[in-house]
């Protein structure tokens, strides 16, 4: 600083960006700015006539060494022990837009699972021409054993019939396979396929069970689906992975020993009729993979023969579905409670929610030098669900038993620091926190008691939709929550 006072201090900055169409000419990238400037001031500078000369102001955020600038440049330099003479590289990106609360849909019991149907969702794309424009729907599964289909106005268009009564009725997972087909499973160890039809006015619908898939001997924790190939993956509490098809012709017969007693008796006597019996089938394969419950099983969207399974035994397995064999095993430090696939140009990544309250990013390739790429910290209870952004490859949302959802931007990272973060590699912190609206003005219980989030999904049309212990589906929307 020498001859200048703190009030007069200036800092040389170098502006960079990966935003297409918003690059500065080489001659304008270096600039002297006041040391006390903040994000808003920097954003105004960039939008000015002498810089980008934007037709309308674009709000920007700025990354410095992988973290968002939330102070003045002066404070940043002081906090990091850097001289004012240092050139600061600022990567500018379009500002993050907070997800705004939109609506909640009431249920009679805990909401265990949600899935989304829209023109931009996987199920909408799998539906092809059968998907009708504007037929955006939410699927919810609950511990009362019921499936519900909702429209955007909060109207329950259809509710499934009760298949089981008693302690085994609860559902753990449900997925759209198309606009007319749904897969669901849970405590009774059975996968059920439902056909969904709507009335001509689209104000009511009907759910009809058409196929039951038997093979597991324990609770089914979650489902992975690929509507294009009509296949389903199941993650079972007994440590096994199931591969199934919804094609009655291709699926093998169901094992008689696992069928409900009434049906098994009728089948032995040859008295079954198509009029009163839902078709039953078995698994294409059941793979004993893990030593503890499997939390998630997901298809690789880039390779139809590959799948991934995450387990409470601390491992992520890469599976060859053609041979039903484990290709590789990646051991982590904690029990894995959820997982999703992140599309990435440089390498595939699996985001796994853990029992240690973190989200771990894992490179599943055998050739990877380091399997744990990054750790996302911020939750204070188990991370029960993760979902990738529909807009880009560097953001995701997580849901936790602490009663919150957190949005993460993987461009904002820092090196691990201190004993607490030893071995975590790069560390990321959330950019937004979504609370449960059901709390109202009440303070959130520390461990999330009463408002635990069990599932969250992110779709370009719907936004972020979550369900949980408060018996509600909650919708939070925001255009370009994290801009691509």
From Swiss-Prot:
PROSITE patterns xref list: WD_REPEATS_1, WD_REPEATS_2, WD_REPEATS_REGION
A Pfam family recorded for this sequence: NLE
WD repeats mapped onto the chain: 121-160, 166-204, 215-254, 289-329, 331-372, 378-418, 448-484
Keywords from the named record: Nucleus, Repeat, Ribosome biogenesis, rRNA processing, WD repeat
SMART domains: WD40 (SM00320)
Keyword Nucleus: yes
Localization: Nucleus, Nucleolus; Nucleus, Nucleoplasm
Region listing for Ubiquitin-like (UBL) domain, in residue ranges: 11-94
Entry-linked InterPro entries: G-protein_beta_WD-40_rep (IPR020472), NLE (IPR012972), WD40/YVTN_repeat-like_dom_sf (IPR015943), WD40_repeat_CS (IPR019775), WD40_repeat_dom_sf (IPR036322), WD40_rpt (IPR001680), WDR12/Ytm1 (IPR028599)
GO CC annotations on file: nucleoplasm; PeBoW complex; preribosome, large subunit precursor
Main localization of the protein described in the UniProt heading: nucleus
Biological processes annotated in GO: chromosome organization; maturation of 5.8S rRNA from tricistronic rRNA transcript (SSU-rRNA, 5.8S rRNA, LSU-rRNA); maturation of LSU-rRNA from tricistronic rRNA transcript (SSU-rRNA, 5.8S rRNA, LSU-rRNA); protein-RNA complex remodeling
Keyword Repeat in record: yes
GO molecular function, one term: ribonucleoprotein complex binding
Family the entry assigns: Belongs to the WD repeat WDR12/YTM1 family.
UniProt function note: Component of the NOP7 complex, which is required for maturation of the 25S and 5.8S ribosomal RNAs and formation of the 60S ribosome.
Record text on subunit structure and interactions: Component of the NOP7 complex, composed of ERB1, NOP7 and YTM1. The complex is held together by ERB1, which interacts with NOP7 via its N-terminal domain and with YTM1 via a high-affinity interaction between the seven-bladed beta-propeller domains of the 2 proteins. The NOP7 complex associates with the 66S pre-ribosome. Interacts (via UBL domain) with MDN1 (via VWFA/MIDAS domain).
Protein name stated in the entry: Ribosome biogenesis protein YTM1
Gene field: YTM1
């Amino acid at each position: 600083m020498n001859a200048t006072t703190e009030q007069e201090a200036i800092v040389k900055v170098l502006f960079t960006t990966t935003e297409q169409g918003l690059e500065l000419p080489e001659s304008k990238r270096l600039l002297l700015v006041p040391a006390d400037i903040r994000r808003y001031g920097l954003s105004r500078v960039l939008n000015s006539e002498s810089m980008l000369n934007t037709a309308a102001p674009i709000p920007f955020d700025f990354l410095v060494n992988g973290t968002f600038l939330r102070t003045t440049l002066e404070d940043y330099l002081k906090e990091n022990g850097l001289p004012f003479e240092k050139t600061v590289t600022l990567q500018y990106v379009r500002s993050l837009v907070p997800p705004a609360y939109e609506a909640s849909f009431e249920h009679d019991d805990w909401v265990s699972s949600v899935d989304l149907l829209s023109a931009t969702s996987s199920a909408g794309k799998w539906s092809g021409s059968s998907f009708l424009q504007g037929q955006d729907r939410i699927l919810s599964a609950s511990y009362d054993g019921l499936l519900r289909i909702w429209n955007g106005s909060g109207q329950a268009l259809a509710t499934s019939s009760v298949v089981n009564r008693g302690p085994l009725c609860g559902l753990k997972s449900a997925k759209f396979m198309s606009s007319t087909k749904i897969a669901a499973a849970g405590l009774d160890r059975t996968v059920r396929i439902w056909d969904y039809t709507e009335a001509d006015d689209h104000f009511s619908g009907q759910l009809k069970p058409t196929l039951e898939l038997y093979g597991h001997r324990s609770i089914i924790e979650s489902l992975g689906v690929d509507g294009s190939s009509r296949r389903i993956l199941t993650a079972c509490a007994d440590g096994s992975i199931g591969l199934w098809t919804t094609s009655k012709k291709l699926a093998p017969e169901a094992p008689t020993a696992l069928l409900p007693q009434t049906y098994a008796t009728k089948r032995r006597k040859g008295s079954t009729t198509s009029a009163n019996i839902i078709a039953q089938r078995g698994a294409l394969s059941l793979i004993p993979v893990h030593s503890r419950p499997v939390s998630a099983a997901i298809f690789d969207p880039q390779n139809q023969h590959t799948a991934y399974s995450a387990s409470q035994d601390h491992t992520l397995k890469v599976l060859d579905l053609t041979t039903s064999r484990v290709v590789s095993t990646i051991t982590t430090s904690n029990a894995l409670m959820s997982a999703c696939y992140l599309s990435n140009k440089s390498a595939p990544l699996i985001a796994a929610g853990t029992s240690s309250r973190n989200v771990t990013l894992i490179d599943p390739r055998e050739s990877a030098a380091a399997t744990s790429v990054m750790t996302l910290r911020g939750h204070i209870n188990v991370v029960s669900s993760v979902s990738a952004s529909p807009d880009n490859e560097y953001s995701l949302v997580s849901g936790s038993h602490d009663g919150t959802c957190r949005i993460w931007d993987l461009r904002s990272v820092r090196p691990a620091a201190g004993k607490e973060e030893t071995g975590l590699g790069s560390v990321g912190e959330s950019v937004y926190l979504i609370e449960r609206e059901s709390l109202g003005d009440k303070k959130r219980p520390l461990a999330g008691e009463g408002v635990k989030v069990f599932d969250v999904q992110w779709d370009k049309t719907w936004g972020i939709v979550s369900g949980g212990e408060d018996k509600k589906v909650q919708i939070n929307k925001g255009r370009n929550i994290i801009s691509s």
